[in-house]
């Protein structure tokens, strides 16, 4: 509570009232009435402010004040008025004659609140504490469940986003890009992305077979991409052109050896491979002895067969790359004949 301006200008007393001050104030108000409270201290001969005189008269010196404890009727009336008006103590004091607002407030805070709580009534809402506690617990449970639902949905969305990010980062799972050891038939699988021709691959295969005496795994720089899936299936299901050519000239022994190498069996014996090379050489020598009339006749007999075979296989297998088939039919016939002629001469020289 703020003080009047006169309290700062004049040297006024503060604190407890003495009995002499109470007597002076009581005699003045009994004779003249209180009138204007700001002029009462000066007229009564008190070194107090008007507000202090008013509160002292209303709360302590007034003759109609009730002294002593509150009755049961007054307690019930205070509870009813507090339920209707709340903490408006001055309005409650007007309904209780002889009681001050300060006295009623002190009695409420010190006594009536505790009585209501012992009876199971909330002193603020004047309702049973059980229902209020249950409602508060329900509100708390609703808040907790809503927060848990929000957290669970957020965690599910995060997991879904992480799985989508991981799947997008991994990409399509076809084959490892750094695979170096592949099947022999994969060396003859041609597509639009592979720039090397089939003829170069066959020449490298023939040179490696003629120069090396030990079996080595066939390596290729061809790395299959997802768009080469059909070409890979085609090469794995349809018999290879190289297998058909060499089986036509060298017999079934080459086919069996190629199947063994396609299975990638690490237990292939070097001795068996050497015997297979000798059998192939004997077959080639037998073939050249029956056709020693002229080398041109061999080329004339071999080239149409090779060309026709490749043309039939390219047209029947429905390869997606028609340009490679046309190039195989037009430009690579002479290369195959020359390579076979070199191979025949090499085997013939080794036999001598």
UniProtKB/Swiss-Prot annotation:
Residues 9-61, 62-116 form the HTH myb-type domain. It is found in: Nucleus. Expressed in stems, flowers and seeds. Weakly expressed in leaves and roots. One of its GO terms (cellular component) is nucleus. Residues 37-61, 89-112 bind DNA. Coiled coil: none annotated. Signal peptide: none annotated. Keywords: Activator, DNA-binding, Nucleus, Repeat, Transcription, Transcription regulation. PROSITE patterns: HTH_MYB (PS51294). InterPro entries: Homeodomain-like_sf, Myb_dom, Plant_SW-associated_TFs, SANT/Myb. One of its GO terms (molecular function) is transcription cis-regulatory region binding. Probable transcription factor. This is Transcription factor MYB86. The gene is MYB86.
């Amino acid at each position: 509570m703020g003080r009047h301006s006169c309290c700062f200008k004049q040297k006024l007393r503060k604190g407890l009232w003495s009995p002499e001050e109470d007597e002076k104030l009581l005699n003045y108000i009994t004779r003249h009435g209180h009138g204007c409270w700001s002029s009462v201290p000066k007229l009564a001969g008190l070194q107090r402010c008007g507000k202090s005189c008013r509160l002292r008269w209303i709360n302590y010196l007034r003759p109609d004040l009730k002294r002593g404890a509150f009755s049961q009727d007054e307690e019930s009336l205070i509870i009813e008025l507090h339920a209707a008006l709340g903490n408006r103590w001055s309005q409650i004091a007007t309904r209780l004659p002889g009681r001050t607002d300060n006295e009623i407030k002190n009695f409420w805070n010190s006594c009536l609140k505790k009585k209501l709580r012992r009876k199971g009534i909330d002193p603020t809402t004047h309702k049973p504490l059980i229902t209020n506690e249950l409602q508060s617990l329900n509100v708390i449970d609703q808040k907790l469940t809503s927060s848990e639902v929000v957290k669970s949905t957020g965690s599910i969305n995060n997991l879904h986003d992480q799985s989508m990010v991981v799947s997008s980062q991994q990409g399509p799972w076809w084959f490892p890009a750094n695979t170096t050891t592949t099947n022999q038939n994969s060396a003859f699988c041609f597509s639009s992305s592979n720039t090397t021709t089939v003829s170069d691959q066959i020449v490298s295969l023939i040179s490696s077979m003629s120069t090396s005496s030990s079996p080595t795994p066939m390596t290729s720089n061809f790395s299959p991409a997802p768009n080469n899936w059909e070409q890979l299936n085609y090469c794995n299901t349809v018999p290879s052109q190289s297998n058909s050519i060499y089986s036509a000239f060298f017999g079934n022994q080459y086919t069996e050896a190629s199947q063994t190498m396609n299975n990638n069996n690490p237990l292939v014996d070097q001795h068996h491979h050497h015997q297979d090379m000798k059998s192939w050489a004997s077959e080639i020598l037998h073939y050249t002895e029956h056709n020693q009339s002229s080398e041109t006749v061999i080329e004339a007999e071999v080239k149409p067969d090779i060309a026709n075979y490749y043309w039939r296989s390219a047209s029947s297998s429905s390869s997606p790359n028609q340009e490679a088939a046309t190039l195989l039919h037009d430009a690579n016939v002479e290369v195959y004949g020359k390579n076979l002629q070199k191979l025949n001469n090499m085997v013939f020289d080794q036999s001598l």
